[in-house]
Amino acid sequence: MKVFILALLALAATTAIAQLETTCSQGFGQSQQQQQPGQRQLLEQMKPCAAFLQQKCSPLRMPFLQTQVEQLSSCQIVQYQCCQQLAQIPERTRCHAIHIVVEAIIQQQSQQQWQEPQQQAQHKSMRMLLENLSLMCNIYVPVQCQQQQQLGQQQQQQLQEQLTPCTTFLQQQCSPVTVPFPQIPVDQPTSCQNVQHQCCRQLSQIPEQFRCQAIHNVAEAIRQQQPQQQWQGMYQPQQPAQLESIRMSLQALRSMCSIYIPVQCPAPTTYNIPLVATYTGGAC
């Protein structure tokens, strides 16, 4: 019986996807003709996401399954396929892929029923769906694509100054703060905790698309500095161990700051960064 139910589910899902892909193909026909071959391939790959973003899905009618399993909707199936496709696309090209899809949808709808006020509302709705994709798929989907330009040396230096707390935290150059009171009501903060808070605050003020460049500039500065200091005269195997420690600290920052920090930067990256006031204080 279970095999029979699963077979019916698979059949219904396949039928729904086939119908959605037909609709997608018809809707994106003109857009695909105007795209480059690489973009056309991405559009083809992202059909489930296009169908989901356009909400071209409906409940699957399977009344005989109501008492056995929860009825799936074609949206749920398409969402799953969309997430599966996104996960297979490298992170650095994910933004480009999803925005090709959105642009195709917007161009199609602009040629159809949307007048100016309705079009703006539709664009806002599309943006919200895009942001929700990150949560639904549990993967990073940028809202804005990075432009392929290099940061200047002065901007990199400004970023490093701005992220001095992160440098201090990653190097673990902090120690317990002596607070004789109150020992029982609250835990004594450490200078590491203070610096971590400052680091997270500075990172949150940097636009999301520039955080990777910023945090990796810091890590690179630490890497270049350390061989000239404590690693001189020591065995080389200790240096990779230190770099691994920095990488682990970088990953820890993602959860501690509750903000997105890529572990690997797409290359090349980005453009002029709106910098906030740089950090000039001490550890506390």
Curated annotation (Swiss-Prot):
**This protein's UniProt keywords:** Disulfide bond, Seed storage protein, Signal, Storage protein
Q: PTMs? A: Contains disulfide bonds.
Q: Which InterPro entries match?
A: Bifun_inhib/LTP/seed_sf, Bifunc_inhib/LTP/seed_store, Glia_glutenin
Superkingdom of the source? Eukaryota
Q: Does the keyword Transcription apply?
A: no
Q: Which GO terms describe its molecular function?
A: nutrient reservoir activity
Report the leader peptide range.
Answer: 1-18
Q: What is known about what this protein does?
A: Seed storage protein. Might be integrated via inter-chain disulfide bonds within the glutenin polymer.
Family per record: Belongs to the prolamin family.
Protein's name according to its UniProt entry: Avenin-like b7
Organism expressing this protein natively? Triticum aestivum (Wheat)
Q: What lineage does UniProt assign to this protein's organism?
A: Eukaryota, Viridiplantae, Streptophyta, Embryophyta, Tracheophyta
